[in-house]
Amino acid sequence: MSYGRIGVIGAMDSELAALIAALAQPAQETVQGLVFHTGRLGVREVVLVRCGIGKVSAARCTQVLIDRFAPGAVINTGIAGGLAGGLAVGDIVVADGLVQHDFDAAPIGFVRGCVCMGDPGAPTVFAPDAV
C-alpha cells in the first residue's frame, strides 16, 4: 500500500530538526502562519511542520496540512506529553487507543476523560487508524 506524500507534524522545533536537516530538495512555504518544509526523505515525498503545543494547535495545523498538501497519511512525531513510567528517551510508542486525559466533565456527571459520548462512567477511548 502506498500513501503518497506523508505529512509529519511536531509540536516543537526540536522534534522536527533532524528530519528538516535530512530533507533532500528542501523548500519552504508559509500558510496561515505555519511554516511547511517540503522535500524528500529517501524515496518518500514529505511535508514537515511545527504545529505548536496543545491539541487545538495540532488540530488546526493538521487541517491546514490536509487542505493545502493533501497527504496520504499524517504522522505526529515528538514526545507526545508522555505520561507512562518506564519510557526512555528514544523509545518509540504506538498508541492502541487515544483518550483526552485533560478533558474533565466531572461537574456534570462524567468521569475524567469522558467526552460526553457513550458511558458517562468510563473515559472515551478512540481507536487509531490501522496502518
What are the functions of these language-model segments?
Residues 83-131:
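Mid-sequence, gly/pro-rich, charge-dense loop/helix-turn segments that line enzyme active sites
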Residues 1-69:
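N-terminal short beta-loop-beta anion/metal-coordinating cradle
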Residues 70-75:
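Proline-aspartate-enriched helix->loop->beta-strand connector
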Residues 15-17, 81-84:
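Short, active-site-adjacent cap segments at secondary-structure transitions
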Residues 2, 6-9, 31, 82-84, ...:
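Homeobox/homeodomain signature
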